[in-house]
Amino acid sequence: MASPSLERPEKGAGKSEFRNQKPKPENQDESELLTVPDGWKEPAFSKEDNPRGLLEESSFATLFPKYREAYLKECWPLVQKALNEHHVNATLDLIEGSMTVCTTKKTFDPYIIIRARDLIKLLARSVSFEQAVRILQDDVACDIIKIGSLVRNKERFVKRRQRLIGPKGSTLKALELLTNCYIMVQGNTVSAIGPFSGLKEVRKVVLDTMKNIHPIYNIKSLMIKRELAKDSELRSQSWERFLPQFKHKNVNKRKEPKKKTVKKEYTPFPPPQPESQIDKELASGEYFLKANQKKRQKMEAIKAKQAEAISKRQEERNKAFIPPKEKPIVKPKEASTETKIDVASIKEKVKKAKNKKLGALTAEEIALKMEADEKKKKKKK
């Protein structure tokens, strides 16, 4: 006999379930489903949602560089205080150079351990505690972009990374204002903290910069998008017609060769035949010498070279024993206390002073002076 569970259902038993389901509207736009209404926030996860806590304890650990040791040691009490509010333990191991976070029996939020892991990762990547602690908020996320392996050449990598920062950090500041994210460029990574929409744009700009696309192009398009988002009508439309289209220009610079060969002037005559070894020996007279004479001559030339090299080496050794030239001793000049008195010049000055009369001139002296002046004028005429 068949069991009641294996019996077939009656006809029309399941039709009522399909009848109750509402048909999906065919003309409904996908953009309306994807858009989030203004002012909507995700409800916070409280202890009432999970009163019994977590079943198992979870932990994450990360290493940090040596230069961050002093800063982490200083701000670690603040890190522990921030994590204790969410019932998460944090330990700093200076010997191993690692940071560890783990849940406790009081932890009620299952996702807080992931946020705590991101916190210690950001602290290891030279992000300040004031910025890194924001990751514990619900509406804030982080992204650590690895850029070290995107460019092979070290010099080219440094140049493109500096292009991302900009002169005096102006490009990075503009990107932070447009995306509402905090961005930190350190070594081979770029750390960003902010909303999800901003992090998506930051990742795109960073990767494009490493692919030799200047960040100013992406910043320009972000500025246009920011203005378009303010318009409620254009929010649900495609923005491709408003965004600028940049053409890629591949300029191939022809590299000059290291060795430049200069062509000689054309001559109809062939080049002169080079002299052979026999011709050289005939010219010097060595060709007619005997074998033992040639050998003796060769040995004499070698000995002469050796003697010259020994003499040069000896001169260089003797240079260390030659004393340096002493500077001539300059005796300090004694200041002469006696001053020479010129008696003759003093006498002349006294005579001139005696001849001079003090006070106004007399009437006779004035008349004589006027006559002398008139005579001088007549002579000039």
Swiss-Prot record:
Residues 7-27, 39-51 have a biased composition (Basic and acidic residues). Pfam families: KH_KRR1_1st (PF17903), KH_KRR1_2nd (PF21800). One of its GO terms (biological process) is ribosomal small subunit biogenesis. Its main location: nucleus. One of its GO terms (cellular component) is chromosome. It is found in: Nucleus, Nucleolus; Nucleus; Cytoplasm. This is KRR1 small subunit processome component homolog. It comes from Homo sapiens.
